Amino acid sequence: MSATTPSSHLIFLGTYTKKGSRGIYAVRLDAASGALSAPTLVAETPDPAWLTLSPDKKFLYALHPSPSQAIGYSVTVTPERTSLTPLAIPASAHVPTAPAPAAQPPSHLAVDATGRTLLAANYRDGFVAAIPLGPDGTLSPPTLTWHSGQGTDPQRQASPHPHSVTVSPDNRFVIVCDLGLDRIFSYALTSPNPGAGGLHSPAATLTPGLTPSVATAPGSGPRHFKFSADGRHAYANTEMGGTIEAFTYHAATGALTPLQSISSLPADFTALKSGAEIRIHPNGRFLYTSNRNHDSLAVFALATGTGLLTSVEIVSCGGKTPRNFALSPDGSWLVCAHQDSPDLTVFRVDASTGRLTPTEHRAPVSMCVCVLFYD
């Protein structure tokens, strides 16, 4: 390895703590071989099912079943150890108007580029929270943006279900996929300047964009969202539709124009569709998504000029219910987590074709549902 290439990548793992897992784990991926170290518990906390880092990587935030919506940790990484130290959650950080029960956790988190706002999509209660962050990483009272309405499926879409929050590359907009409404919302993000002499800035504000939302197919359920490497296009996977929706992204207004819809499943698949995660390769040329009920990973070639997708392959994920996966920063490896089988699987990634080759490397983690590369 060169002096600038790490010999291993640190990964944080989020879990559901129902079948033996106890919280957030850390594991290392050998950059040359793809081998995984034994996972170690770094934070004992209930159901940290989504994790995100501050831009400077000093703080990690996890979903938390409390009125604060999330819990923060200071991150310490040395050659000898990796540790997470929980930050205090003051009572003032609690959601002021959350409906009972007031401890419903969100489904997804993101930190804006300034590191001063934590955004949370609350699937169960139907709102998006903008939570101010102090220089010490601690949370303050949020502002809430509520969604209203319903979709076409009376069981799954009787009310709004914001499923993810994604900050635009220029930090001017927040994109929210609402599974319950079959809509993807675009909000202008106003991040206030740090308060003079105060610990926390005022809360950021979310204002509907000039084109406030774009519809997906009825009953499709948009879930997660990613921007292309050049920021000209964007992609959402649909949980209930089993598709990838491609858009032209208009950076000046935050608007999305539908471009393409392509299935992530084989043509002969007739069981319940359940799309999970979506990622774009660091080189910008390939898109990956996971299909839970099919236990597969789908690979697409991404035309950087037009933004259009072409199917490359669909491969077994090597486990059951691939709720989450992530690519290493150098794009050489893909690590897949499984909600219903107790292990991680590792794939070698061909950077020229996007294709995945399974390896023998695994690591035991029960109900792992989030993979977050630290470096």
Q: What are these model-predicted stretches?
A:
Residues R28-G34, S74-T82, I131-L139, A188-G195, ...:
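Short loop/turn segments immediately following beta-strands, especially the blade-tip
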Residues A38-V111, G115:
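Blade-loop segments of beta-propeller domains
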